[in-house]
Amino acid sequence: MRHILERIFFTSFAKKGWLKMLCAFEGLVDEKTKERLRKRNYHGNTCLHIATEEHRGRQAIWLIEKLVEYGADLDEKKHCDGDTVLHMAVKKGDYKLATWMCQQLSMRFGSRKLSQPHGVSSSIEKR
């Protein structure tokens, strides 16, 4: 029962942008919670995809940072079209989020050369 409630809560918090409520769960996060954050809703989206669809700029970044801290995966692809959060941010013109995402990816991969998704780097550079 707890796993169903957690998934509903995290999905709702991501959709509504309730960062304070999300932060209130900090002490309750365990390995099982991390697995549940990667689960998909009935549309095939994770909490990260929902936060990206519903919010822009700084608000999206704050939510995504917290979800990743709890165990969500930045590289998770949407079920329907294979887009990552970075693809979604670029497609909707949220270049603040896209730039932040690129910074996160380069920090995670260090000096390893990244192969950027087609059109992402050129779209960001135009802004």
Curated annotation (Swiss-Prot):
Gene3D superfamilies registered for this protein in UniProt: Ankyrin repeat-containing domain (1.25.40.20)
GO MF annotations in UniProt: NF-kappaB binding
GO biological-process terms attached to the record: cellular response to tumor necrosis factor; symbiont-mediated suppression of host NF-kappaB cascade
Cross-referenced Pfam families: Ank_2 (PF12796)
Keywords: ANK repeat, Host-virus interaction, Inhibition of host NF-kappa-B by virus, Repeat
Renumbered ranges of ANK repeats: 43-76, 81-111
Family the UniProt entry places it in: Belongs to the polydnaviridae I-Kappa-B-like protein family.
PANTHER family from the UniProt entry: NF-KAPPA-B INHIBITOR ALPHA, NF-KAPPA-B INHIBITOR CACTUS
Name the record gives this protein: I-Kappa-B like protein J1
Organism of provenance: Microplitis demolitor bracovirus (isolate Webb)
Designated gene of the protein: J2
